[in-house]
Amino acid sequence: MSLFSRLSTWYFSKKSLPYWGIILLDCCLILFSGLLVYTLNNGVLSTLDILGHLLVTLLVCLIPYLVGFRLFHTYSGIIRYSSFVDLQKVGFAVLFGLICVVVFQVLTDFSPYLVYIRKRDLILSALLAMSLMWMMRVFVKYFYVSTFRVAKAERAFIYGVKQGGVSLAKSIQNQDPARFVLAGFISDMAEIGNRYLMGVKVYPNNEDLIGVMRRLQADVLLVSPLKVEAIRNNQEMVDRLIKANIKIYMTPAAQEWDGKSDLSHTQLREVNIEDLLPRDKIEIDLEAVREQLTGKRILITGAAGSIGSEIVRQVAQFAPERMVLIDQAETPLHDVRLMMARGWPDIESYTVVSDICVRERMEELFEEHRPDYVFHAAAYKHVPMMEDNPEESVRNNVDGTRVIADLSVKYGTRKFVMVSTDKAVNPTIVMGCSKRICEIYVQSLDQAIKDGKVRGRTQFVTTRFGNVLGSNGSVIPLFKEQIKRGGPVTVTHKDIIRFFMLIPEACKLVLEAGTMGNGGEIFVFDMGKPVRIVDLAERMIRLSGVKGIEIRFTGLRDGEKLYEEVLNEEETSKPTFHPKIKIAQVRAYDYADANLRIDALVHACAVEGDMQIVKRMKEIVPEFKSQHSKYEVLDE
């Protein structure tokens, strides 16, 4: 290693050069400039004759420059991070020193020990010194950036050329150590021409994009906040990037960025598969929901689950008077309790570990808190588990719903909102059928109240939607775990498709549908475009960067469909107040008959076997046809 390399490595390994070191360098440059200008104007021999006196003169002239350095703090910055502001400070300090020297020369007679320097030479030496100080700072910064700061940085393109992309570019240029080096911008404008932005070229977003990135050795794409929605809805572009092993990083979406503040490079994160699935932006009438929930008493069952905990989060933002949060899972409910204490300490909240099927305990809670709104998210949801344990599906899902619904009526709850599932439509599984029975019960109870057959004021609303991204036990966390273990990734069938929705988006629609409904409705959510599960698995494997992960097809599970529905053959839908929400028009059931059938079903769970229990479920829901299941014999 050369001496220069050793010195530069030593210097840049330090946090900064001591301030006296910067002052010493600047003083040397001023002395050198004065000596050089005088020599060029008066000759080498003449300069050598008076060299001692000349050096004394230059040292005296240095004093006002030192005062200027002090006044303008030219030594307070770190040279490797010099900016235009730092160069300005140097310019002002040199100008101050020059003016002081000229004024001193005009007002006083120079001592015989000092050499008279013409004003022109003083000005030229000051300009030269200032230029050298600027050059020194620019060189150190450039050398540091090009050699040390970006040594381990990845070359990156930025998708987006407006304020979001520019702010992102500025952010990554100020990183230390650098994570990324800007190699180019990508624009959706058809005709880009030969345009440059912040010193790099702007390229069109077309089929040549991957080739351009490879040619420039860029293997990272940074997505501007204003382009988050665009890349989600451009699946062709996403597929090309993933297949080329281009890593994608995202910043907060446009709605989370005010468009003015600087973006921090710490906000950049590598995308998850959830970030890249196509979805429409969902807006709800926040003021209408706020008007319904603010200052009210809210009870939420299943409050520690994926959906329930998000409902807790979103309801808390509307400042209810009291929240009663029920779940039988102790540890995750404790996490919800801590979240409430940390995020909404002013809300009176109660976390209750209990089974919703225990009517006596639930009645104590209703009598004490008398909730205005009930959000019922508690349910067993795992398909294979419920196929093996139909009595628990009935006990928890069906009877638990009936307990909470009956108590809501008894204690004057204004509105009961039940979270259902698209698996309740033409059910082929026990879990889906149990949720359909829940729908039948709350709908028939709502109609009985309207008809005056049951005394009460409660309005019952059902919300029905499909899979949510990232919920506990869902396919995406499962695939992540399988990839982490090295595979294989298991998919039940190559043609299986599913609808997906983000948990926060689903819960927004639950809140709006629940608060806006008039009772008796089954609200069906528009889940967007379906996703092939095998395509999802392939994308996740590519995003992980792990090679050689096998996808293994295991066959459809008991009761599993190739695709899910939100309406059955006999149901139609009509539009509502929200374009993403429709009302399913389903056939009505008699409350007394439904209640008797459910009584018999719940009793059967205590005295009969699985086959008899499922047979009774099929009698209540005739469209329940088992598939790939031991219960298929009951349909013959």
Give the ranges of each region predicted by the language model.
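Conserved Rossmann-fold NAD(P)-dependent oxidoreductase catalytic core, especially the SDR/UDP-sugar
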Residues: 244, 258-260, 376, 382-383, ...
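Conserved Rossmann-fold cofactor-binding substructure of NAD(P)-dependent oxidoreductases
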Residues: 353-373
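N-terminal Rossmann NAD(P)H-binding glycine-rich loop of SDR-like oxidoreductase domains
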Residues: 298-316
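Signature of alpha-helical transmembrane segments in polytopic membrane proteins
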Residues: 1-152, 180, 196, 219, ...
